Amino acid sequence: MHSDKLKSHFDNKVVWLTGASSGIGRALAIALSKYDCQLYLSSRTHDQLVKTRDMCDQPENVHIEAGDLSVLETNKTICKKIEAQSGQLDIAILNAGTCEYVDVNNFDSALFERLITHNYLSMVYGIEASLPLLKESADAQLVGMSSTAGYLGIPRSEAYGSTKAAIINMLRALKVSLKPNNIDVSVICPGFVKTELTDRNDFPMPAMISAELAAEHIVKGIVKRTHEI
């Protein structure tokens, strides 16, 4: 894709990116910082967000808003700060989440609760907090991170895959529901990406790509307004 098209898409936009302290989120922050947008980064770990900002091309355009995104009020507070500082929000990229694997010999409902909270509900809260601002934007996009695991019943991924399937379903529905509000909705469904999370895996991961390459594909998908990236 021509660099001018990428540039024109993000220039003068206000972007909120969650889960920006590591992995795909960090790579996305670095990729987006090349453009003249105001970039707000969120995650639970302030120090790691500072590291992400230090790696960005235009750190003066990168703002840190740390907090626990599994709490609704945290999301609302961050969006209020974005509105107060920048007056608008054009693109919300809700990427925060984690991964744990199920042991069927020690089936633990608490693990499911954790992943539902951190993967699914954190996105629901981010949507609730950001929608009022996105509805005011003339060119809004809502983007959520899922996974190919959301399409497949992978052993040990019963909890993780379920949350990702829920995200796919929700964003497919919102694509239709938010059309009258002129909000484009995309869902990101990567395969294996080399990150701190996948470094912990103890099984083969075919066709793995780097976080940087994943971020490149995601940015292009956002510009094309592709629903499933």
What are these model-derived regions, one by one?
Residues S21-S22:
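Conserved glycine-rich cofactor-binding loop
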Residues Y35-T52:
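Conserved glycine-rich Rossmann-like NAD(P)H-binding loop of the short-chain dehydrogenase/reductase
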Residues A66-T77, S109:
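The beta1-alpha1 cofactor-binding region of Rossmann-like NAD(H)/NADP(H)-dependent oxidoreductases
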Residues D103-I116:
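Substrate-binding pocket helix/loop in short-chain dehydrogenase/reductase
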Residues I127, T163:
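Active-site helix of classical SDR
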Residues S147:
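Residue(s) in the substrate-gating loop at a strand-loop-helix junction
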Residues V187, F203-I229:
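C-terminal helical subdomain
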